[in-house]
Each structure stands twice: as structure tokens, then as C-alpha cells.
């Protein structure tokens, strides 16, 4: 961790069974979770790592895409593979996946399972519905740890669908062994401009909310 909030996030992962890392792109929320997962595997705290994210961009049409199931879902899981390659020898990843030590799968494939003795990361959680979030969190099994990451400003769900990440804190806040960590543009560790870009968009969104739909000028018809 390079910032105070990142250290708090890492400490929360160590101290809690379920941790939420919420913040904009580039804050290290997924990278740090992946680092802790690999560490837990190497120190035999868990026997496997499970990485998942909702393939929301594919919607229900994934079955109509050409190719095998793996070829269909891999593009939506690519960011998780990329993060994993930063942590372990890339040549070892096929072996780890083949042995079941590392599993990368879309969120829909978690339904009906109990995830024991695993470090489980749900990425892009802003694109879960409240029902999907509940489904995922109740997969928690014995000896497992869950980290949920996401950015509530980047929701890609269809109109009218609530984000499970936006409502979950109000539901679970205050429950023992669950932590919520918020990261900001000050925690961005990518190119220095990324933090400035994130901050600029935050300011724009604040102004848009203040003067948006309720501004009569904006709603006035042009003659």
C-alpha cells in the first residue's frame, strides 16, 4: 500500500472475513485484494483463489456469442487475469487453473455453491443487482475470506436496476467481521493524471447533480 487509505484497506482485509473496497479506477482496490489473495494462498491460509465479476456487458446474450464457453466469458474476465499475472509467474497460471487452485469465473457461476477454504474476490461489484450481491455473499463457506471491489460511479446496469454495491453498506454496516473501506482520487496510483481526471469528473458530477434535472432552464423547450 502506498497511501494511508490503502493501508487501512489492507489491514481491514487481514482483520475481517468480508471486506468491501469502494473507490474510483486506479486506487489499487483490486490489485491489493489480489496481492492479499496470493499471499493467503502461499502461506496456506486458504487452498484456492476464486476471482469473479459480473459479465454485465454480455447480458443474457452470451449464449449467442460464437465459440466455447471459455472463449465467450474470457473477455469479461480479462482484467482479473491481468491482475493475477502481476502477482504470479504467468506461465504457472494455466497449471493453477487446471488444478483448481485458481478459478476465474463469471458471477452467475457462483449460484448454488458453498465456497470453503478460499480467498474470493468479486470485482466490478457495482454491476451486481442487490439480489446478485446477496447471492454472492451467502456463498461464504468455512475458512474463507471475501473481498468485494467496485466503483459506484461506473454502474453499467440497465436503467431502473439498482446497484447492489450502492445499497449493501446500508444493509450490512455495523455487522461484526464486515468492513467497508472507501478510497478516493487521492489514492490513485496509476499515472499522476488519472487522479486529476477522477477528481475533475467528481466535481463535474457534483455540479450536474446540483443543476441537472431540477434546473428549469435545462428543461425549457427550445422554440
Q: Residue spans of the language-model regions?
A:
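Conserved helicase motor core of SF1/SF2 NTP-dependent helicases
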Residues: 1-6, 12-122, 126-223
Amino acid at each position: 500500500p502506498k497511501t494511508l487509505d490503502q493501508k487501512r484497506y489492507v489491514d481491514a482485509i487481514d482483520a475481517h472475513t468480508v471486506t468491501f473496497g469502494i473507490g474510483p479506477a486506479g486506487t489499487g482496490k483490486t490489485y491489493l485484494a489480489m496481492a492479499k489473495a496470493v499471499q493467503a494462498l502461499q502461506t496456506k491460509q486458504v487452498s484456492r483463489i476464486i476471482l469473479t465479476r459480473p459479465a454485465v456487458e454480455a447480458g443474457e446474450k452470451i449464449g449467442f456469442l460464437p465459440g466455447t464457453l471459455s472463449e465467450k466469458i474470457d473477455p469479461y474476465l480479462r482484467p482479473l487475469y491481468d491482475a493475477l499475472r502481476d502477482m504470479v509467474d504467468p506461465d504457472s497460471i494455466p497449471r493453477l487453473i487446471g488444478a483448481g487452485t485458481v478459478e476465474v469465473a463469471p458471477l452467475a457461476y457462483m449460484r448454488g455453491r458453498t465456497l470453503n477454504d478460499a480467498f474470493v474476490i468479486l470485482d466490478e461489484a457495482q454491476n451486481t443487482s442487490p439480489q446478485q450481491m446477496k447471492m454472492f455473499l451467502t456463498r461464504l463457506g468455512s475458512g474463507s475470506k471475501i473481498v468485494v471491489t467496485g466503483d459506484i460511479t461506473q454502474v453499467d446496469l440497465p436503467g431502473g436496476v439498482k446497484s447492489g454495491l450502492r445499497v449493501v453498506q446500508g444493509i450490512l454496516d455495523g455487522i461484526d467481521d464486515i468492513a467497508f473501506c472507501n478510497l478516493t482520487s487521492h489514492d490513485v496510483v496509476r499515472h499522476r493524471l488519472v487522479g486529476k481526471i477522477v477528481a475533475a469528473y467528481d466535481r463535474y458530477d457534483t455540479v450536474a447533480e446540483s443543476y441537472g434535472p431540477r434546473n428549469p432552464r435545462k428543461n425549457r423547450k427550445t422554440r
